[in-house]
C-alpha cells in the first residue's frame, strides 16, 4: 500500500481527541457501557465524533477543526455536557485521567470491531492492558515537508507535554511512582517511540515503502509513534498526553501546541537533527517518572536543568505568539500550575492521601470532569 498524499490544511488549526473512562457509580470501577453510550450520543447533534476504543469500558471523542484553544474548549464543552447527560441516563460516570486507578486488565473485553479484534489477536494481553486513556492533538501544517519539520521540532518538547498532562500515577490499585504510567503501556508496542529523522516527504514516502515491503506495517495507523504525520488531515498528531481530568486543561494543552507551532512557523528557530534524539528517551523517561520534578537535558547544549524551569522559560518565550493565537489565558493557566509543581497526577495523589480509597478518588475525578467541584 502506498502512502496517502498529504492533504491541504489551514496552518495551525487544531483538532483534539480524548479517550475517556466509563465507570459505574457503585464503586467507580470501569463499566462496559461503550455501546450504550455511543447509541445515546448518536442522537445528539455535536461537533466532531464519538467512537469506540479498544475495550468496551472506554470511548474516544474528538472535536472538529478548530482555530484556537478557546474554540477547542467550546466544542469540548458541548461534547462533555452531552456525555454527562448520556451517562446520567445509564447511571454511570465519565472520567478523565490516563489510567483507571484500580481496574484489573484481565477483566476487560475487546470492543467488537474488526480492527480491535485483529489487534487483540496480534498483541495478546497487551491489547487489554491498552485500556489507557490519552489525549491526541492535531495541528495543521502548510505542506508535507513543513509537517515533518514541525514534527521533529515538537519532539524537543515531548517531556513538557508529558509532565503538563501527566494523570496516571496509579495502576491496578498501586502507586507506580510514575506521574505518567500510561506511557509505559505504549512503549511495549514494537512500533512505538519516535519517527525516523527524515525532513522531506519524498524521503518519508521511501521509508514508508520500505516498511510496507517488510510486511510489518500496512498503514500509518500501525505506527504508535509519539508524534506521527496524518496525511489524510494535513496535520501532525501528538500522542503523548495523558487525558487530563478536565476539558479546560485539555484545551489549554492544545493552545500550548498551537503557540509552539506559531513560533516555529514565524521564526524557524532551529533545524532538527538526529543528535536531538541522543537524549530523547532519557528526557521522556524523566518526564514520565518525575513529572514536574524531572530533569531536562537540552538537546542543543547538553545542559541539565529542572524540566519545570524549561517549561516556564518556553511559555515565556512564546508568549507573543500566544497573544496572536488567543492562547494567553491558556498559557497563563499552564504556567501558574507548572510554577507550583502542580499537575493532575499530583491532584490524584493528594486526593488519595486524604481519602485513602481509590474508589473515592475516582468519584471525585468524575465530578471534576463534569465541571462540578470535587
Curated annotation (Swiss-Prot):
Catalysed reaction(s) here are:
L-cysteine + L-glutamate + ATP = gamma-L-glutamyl-L-cysteine + ADP + phosphate + H(+)
InterPro entries, A to Z: GCL_type2/YbdK_subfam, GCS2, Gln_synth/guanido_kin_cat_dom, YbdK
Picking any one GO molecular function of the record gives:
ATP binding
Write down the top EC class of this protein: ligase
UniProt keyword list: ATP-binding, Ligase, Nucleotide-binding
Q: Which Pfam families match?
A: GCS2
Q: Which SUPFAM superfamilies match?
A: Glutamine synthetase/guanido kinase (SSF55931)
**What EC number(s) does the entry state?**
6.3.2.2
Swiss-Prot/TrEMBL GO biological process terms: modified amino acid biosynthetic process
Signal sequence annotation? none
- Function, as annotated: ATP-dependent carboxylate-amine ligase which exhibits weak glutamate--cysteine ligase activity.
Entry's family note = Belongs to the glutamate--cysteine ligase type 2 family. YbdK subfamily.
Please state what the protein is called.
Answer: Putative glutamate--cysteine ligase 2
Q: Which organism is it from?
A: Paracidovorax citrulli (strain AAC00-1)
Amino acid at each position: 500500500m502506498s502512502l496517502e498524499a498529504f492533504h491541504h490544511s489551514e496552518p495551525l488549526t487544531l483538532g483534539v481527541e480524548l479517550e475517556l473512562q466509563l465507570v459505574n457509580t457503585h464503586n467507580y470501577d470501569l463499566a462496559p457501557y461503550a455501546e450504550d453510550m455511543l447509541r445515546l450520543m448518536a442522537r445528539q447533534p455535536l461537533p466532531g465524533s464519538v467512537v469506540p476504543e479498544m475495550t468496551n469500558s472506554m470511548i474516544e471523542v474528538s472535536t472538529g477543526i478548530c482555530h484556537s484553544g478557546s474554540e477547542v474548549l467550546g466544542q469540548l464543552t458541548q461534547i462533555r455536557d452531552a456525555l454527562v447527560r448520556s451517562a446520567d441516563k445509564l447511571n454511570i460516570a465519565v472520567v478523565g485521567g490516563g489510567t483507571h486507578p484500580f481496574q484489573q486488565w484481565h477483566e476487560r473485553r475487546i470492543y467488537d470491531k474488526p480492527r480491535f479484534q485483529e489487534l487483540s489477536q496480534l498483541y495478546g494481553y497487551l491489547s487489554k492492558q491498552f485500556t489507557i486513556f490519552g489525549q491526541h492533538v492535531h495541528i495543521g501544517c502548510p505542506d508535507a515537508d513543513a509537517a515533518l519539520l514541525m514534527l521533529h521540532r515538537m519532539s524537543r518538547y515531548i517531556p513538557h507535554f508529558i509532565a503538563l498532562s501527566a494523570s496516571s500515577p496509579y495502576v491496578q490499585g498501586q502507586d507506580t511512582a510514575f506521574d505518567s504510567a500510561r506511557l509505559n503501556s505504549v512503549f511495549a508496542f514494537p512500533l512505538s517511540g519516535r519517527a525516523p529523522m527524515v525532513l522531506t516527504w519524498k524521503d518519508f514516502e521511501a521509508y514508508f515503502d520500505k516498511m510496507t515491503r517488510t510486511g510489518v506495517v500496512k498503514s500509518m495507523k500501525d505506527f504508535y509513534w509519539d508524534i506521527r504525520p496524518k496525511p489524510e488531515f494535513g496535520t501532525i498528531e501528538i500522542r503523548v498526553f495523558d487525558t487530563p481530568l478536565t476539558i479546560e486543561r485539555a484545551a489549554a494543552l492544545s493552545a500550548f501546541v498551537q503557540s509552539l507551532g506559531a513560533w516555529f512557523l514565524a521564526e524557524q528557530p532551529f533545524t532538527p537533527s538526529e543528535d536531538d534524539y541522543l537524549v530523547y528517551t532519557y528526557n521522556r523517561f524523566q518526564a514520565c517518572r518525575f513529572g514536574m520534578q524531572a530533569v531536562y537535558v537540552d538537546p542543543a547544549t547538553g545542559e541539565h536543568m529542572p524540566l519545570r524551569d524549561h517549561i516556564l522559560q518556553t511559555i515565556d518565550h512564546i508568549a507573543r505568539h500566544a497573544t496572536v493565537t488567543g492562547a494567553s489565558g491558556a498559557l497563563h493557566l499552564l504556567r501558574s500550575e507548572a510554577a507550583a509543581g502542580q499537575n493532575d497526577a499530583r491532584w490524584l495523589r493528594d486526593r488519595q492521601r486524604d481519602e485513602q480509597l481509590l474508589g473515592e478518588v475516582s468519584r471525585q475525578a468524575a465530578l471534576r470532569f463534569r465541571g462540578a467541584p470535587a
